[in-house]
Amino acid sequence: MKILIPTAKEMNTDLPSIEATPLKPESQAVLDALALYSASQLESFYKVSAEKATEEFQNIQALKRQTAQHYPALKLFDGLMYRNIKRDKLTEAEQDYLENHVFITSALYGVVPALSPMAPHRLDFLMKLKVAGKTLKSHWKAVYDEALKKEEVIFSLLSSEFETVFSKEIRAKMVTFKFMEDRGGQLKIHSTISKKARGAFLTALIENQVQTVGEARRLNFAGFVYREDLSQPQGLVFVKEV
């Protein structure tokens, strides 16, 4: 069983660095394509300020020169979902579960264990980078599929932009999750609720060592409970009354 989570734009580098591992050929090809952009070209590519583009240019060039600082990916990313994941003071069993079951899907690194070394970078599958004439999704599809082909159960906490990198055969094995708030009988869903809830849900999976869909259905976390009436066999819905 594997649990898939996306990367995040926000990062925290105020951490002890760890040793880098060599880039896969597929990752190196993406990096080589990114490294062709000047700082001013990155400004329009990323749709960011000149200052931010310069920072990203320096990150890319540091990776290219193999001088970039690397950090455990789960701790480097610091978006709303990540800030709601239990990342410190894990028991030995929780640490083992995290290492064996939780994987991050990255447009630069591929599908990798959550504590893999990553350097600060900005890239997702909505960005129009061409790698040897292919889109990022086409470039990664075979590698993404290979990472999961032996899995019977895949818990996806990904957005559709990441899920669609995988083939239909792999996506057919995915269990997806939706998190909603019940405000006086009105069911609400928005990105802030979803991101926080994904982090809290992953924490509950880790703490309870969940291995099956049945075990996931029984979880109560951060006020969320499973709603069978709203769910599908491979699309679980959790609702929090507020």
Swiss-Prot record:
- What are the GO cellular component annotations? cytosol
Question: What name does UniProt use for this protein?
Answer: UPF0246 protein SPCG_1533
HAMAP family noted in UniProt: UPF0246
Q: Which family does it belong to?
A: Belongs to the UPF0246 family.
For the biological process aspect of GO, one term held by this record is: response to hydroperoxide
Q: Which domain of life is it from?
A: Bacteria
